[in-house]
Swiss-Prot record:
Documented EC number(s): 4.3.2.2
The family this protein is said to belong to: Belongs to the lyase 1 family. Adenylosuccinate lyase subfamily.
InterPro entries: AdenyloSucc_lyase_C, Fumarase/histidase_N, Fumarate_lyase_CS, Fumarate_lyase_fam, Fumarate_lyase_N, L-Aspartase-like, Pur_lyase
GO biological process, one term: 'de novo' AMP biosynthetic process
Source organism superkingdom: Bacteria
Quaternary context: Homotetramer. Residues from neighboring subunits contribute catalytic and substrate-binding residues to each active site.
Xref: Pfam families: ADSL_C, Lyase_1
Residues annotated to bind N(6)-(1,2-dicarboxyethyl)-AMP: 4-5, 73-75, 99-100, 218, 269, 274-276, 282, 313-317
Gene: purB
NCBIfam families from the UniProt entry: purB
Catalytic site: 147, 268
Keywords: Lyase, Purine biosynthesis
Name of this protein: Adenylosuccinate lyase
Pathway field: Purine metabolism; AMP biosynthesis via de novo pathway; AMP from IMP: step 2/2; Purine metabolism; IMP biosynthesis via de novo pathway; 5-amino-1-(5-phospho-D-ribosyl)imidazole-4-carboxamide from 5-amino-1-(5-phospho-D-ribosyl)imidazole-4-carboxylate: step 2/2
Phylogenetic classification of the source organism: Bacteria, Thermotogati, Deinococcota, Deinococci, Deinococcales
Amino acid sequence: MIDRYLTPEMKVLWSEANKYRAWLKVELSALQAQARHGEVPAEAHAALVQKSEADPLDDAFAQQVAEIEAVTRHDIVAFTRALTERYGEEARFIHHGLTSTDVVDTAQNLLLDEAMGLIITDVQTLREVCRMQAAAHKHTPVVGRTHGIHAEPMTFGLKFLNWMATLDRDLERLQAARGRVQVVMLSGSVGTYAHVSPKIEEEVAESWGWHAAPVTNQTLARDRHAEVLAALAILGTTLEKIAVEIRHLQRSEVREAMEPFGKGQTGSSSMPHKKNPILTENVTGFARLLRGFLATGLENVALWHERDISHSSAERVILPDATASASYATRRLTGVLRDLVVFPERMLKNLDDLGGLVFSQRVLHALIDDKGMMREAAYGIVQRNALKSWETGEGLRDLLKADPENPLSDAELDAAFDLQWYLRHVDDIYARFGM
């Protein structure tokens, strides 16, 4: 991911040096288990731990690996050679009985686990901001729109409550996907443990609080990674849904809410008046990326026989970029919603703009329930006057009052056009969330 869209945590997490630190953690964990079983000298493991703590792998080590790999054309071989040069004779026990993918896949799971943890925290923060705004605007009336057209009154807080509920489901998916990669694979070249005991894998997994992969070939099955990418892609659609709503609400014709606009900020190089929804447009773009990463992740599932490396080049891009994109976009949207500028007066004005058309269903029910009219006849009266209101701009209540076929009295019309009728169950909805 380019630096422009990297959070500080993701930049460190997906650095080359940190990748090699994860590789070393796998190697040392395996070595520790092997030492317990007398397969390698315990003092070799102890010495390597001491040296790695005193001289941790850094950017210089990553550059050293790159230089060796330019000759070997094999990253794990370059890694183990660089370890030997850095830590000395004891490093010869590194990689004992393992194959490259044992280290790469298990270490990649360490990085994915940490990345998913960061994203889950980000989403929890976004959810809390939605809860805060839902509470603040619980009783702020706004017109609900279906197909982009005014439908019926609702409250602005219900939008946030809907988003909060969706984020709860996202969190469930993210947690499940994170668990799917909390597995250790140390099973050898084709998954038969030919040169390493299954006990080593099991003990490493237990020491991390993870599980040993029950069966593998040379790689972990890529449906696990696809599930991670799917959870991130679905999160992206949630972020996009929220972002698109804010973009629509900021339109000049609507202007019910808008992104924060900082002091000194400019909206256009040529039009000084512009305040564009650039932050939520940015989030929309990340959602598109996340769906694209998923498509590639699904392609990676079907590998040849016990493995090929067609997935490798793709994963080196999509896993860091997908997790980085999800984290960045979530944090960006969190900032937008936290500092969202809301215009309740404009919301009321927009509610009134169509001259009461948003109350048409209440009138329909009054004719059916209170006056005993057949639905078709009642619908005809309301629709005829509603269409006239669309065409002339006259208020629906005034048109109905003047319609000789309308049996509703002034008091009954007042009741039908009562805004609070539409909002009377808002408290019940909030109660489902303990609010």
